[in-house]
Regions:
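Thiamine diphosphate
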Residues: 1-213, 217-220, 269, 273-284, ...
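A short alpha/beta connector and helix-capping loop motif
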Residues: 44, 63, 73, 233-256
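DG-centered beta-turn motif at the end of beta-strands
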Residues: 47-53, 220-241
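Long, charge-dense
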Residues: 84-86, 258-265
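Active-site flanking residues adjacent to catalytic metal/cofactor-binding acidic residues
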Residues: 136, 225-229, 255
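Short, function-defining helix-loop hinge/capping sites that tune catalysis or transport
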Residues: 145, 236-238, 264
């Protein structure tokens, strides 16, 4: 049960390649945790892989599901680092405080052995019967390439960079607040939208739309640039915003590339979703067809 991270790319890609493993991508860490709990209580052997910044999304599941019901399974958490001046500011706090957060949940913690495969397997297996989290440091695993038939084939008719550049030209120096979701979208906005008023949401995945809603409720004209994986992480925000959609000036642009691009390009497995229908049912006025030209 996985929410991708670039530090965990190699073990995630190996689980996708391996036919003996069922790879279950989850919309959020809380969902991954709940799925794993259901699997464990049904006699299966789940493993959860997440990144450190997502552990907080699991806290309620840990304290109100796993601990009171005595459910244990391996949880692998990649330890994202931070150095002063890095753009990934969302990792600053837990780059130091991750061990303390784990301890506060009543879990043991252990850094996964990167030099001894057998020992690392034993470390993971020990989590099956105790409250214990294994921490994955950067470059713990050897490089793994996804098999060609496991790589998401994209069919984008227009590049996000080109679209963002056009937004910059259209809204140059206008009183409109742009909010970019975490990952490549915000990075590309920083580079290709220099003349607009932008807020770059480096972390807090799934929260860009809700931030935009708060700004729009205060009277601002807001355009949110979101992504397909971000769309589902906290989809309740969509229904909350949709309730007041007719009373605010907010536009939500969803870039659907079918991938978690910034964490290694893993498939989001969301081809079954009708984003337009979901947004419309939540209360949004929508374009009936995806935008494929400028």
């Amino acid at each position: 049960c996985v929410v991708p991270c670039s530090f965990s790319k190699n073990e995630i890609d190996e689980s996708i390649n391996n036919n003996n493993i069922e790879y279950l991508p989850a919309a959020s860490e809380a969902i991954a945790c709940s799925i794993a709990a259901g699997l464990k209580m049904s006699g299966k052997k789940p493993i959860v892989i997440i990144q450190s910044s997502g552990l907080s999304n699991m806290v309620s599941c840990i304290t109100s599901l796993l601990k009171p019901y005595g459910v244990t399974f391996p949880i692998l958490v990649s330890w994202r680092t931070y150095s002063e001046g890095d753009s990934e500011i969302q990792h600053k706090h837990l780059s130091k405080e991750l061990p303390n957060l784990i301890s506060s949940l009543g879990y043991q913690k252990e850094i996964l052995d990167s030099s001894d495969l057998i020992n690392s397997i034993n470390q993971i297996n020990s989590c099956n019967e105790k409250y214990k989290i294994c921490i994955i440091e950067k470059n713990t695993f050897d490089k793994v390439e996804l098999y060609n038939d496991r790589i998401k084939k994209t069919n984008s008719k227009i590049s996000r960079v080109r679209y963002l550049s056009s937004l910059n030209d259209l809204y140059k120096n206008k009183d409109i607040l742009f909010i970019g979701t975490t990952g490549h979208t915000s990075r590309e906005m920083f580079k290709f939208m220099p003349n607009t008023n932008n807020f770059y949401m480096a972390g807090n995945m799934g929260g860009a739309l809700s931030i935009g809603f708060g700004a729009a409720k205060s009277g601002r004209n807001v355009i949110v640039c979101g992504g397909d994986a971000e769309f589902v992480m906290h989809m309740g925000g969509l229904t909350t915003v949709g309730r007041d959609a007719d009373e605010i000036n907010l536009t939500y642009i969803l870039f659907d590339n079918g991938q978690n691009k910034s964490t290694g390009g893993q498939d989001t497995y969301q081809d079954h979703l009708n984003y337009i229908g979901i947004a419309e049912n939540a209360g949004f006025q929508v374009f009936r067809k995806p935008i494929d030209s400028i």
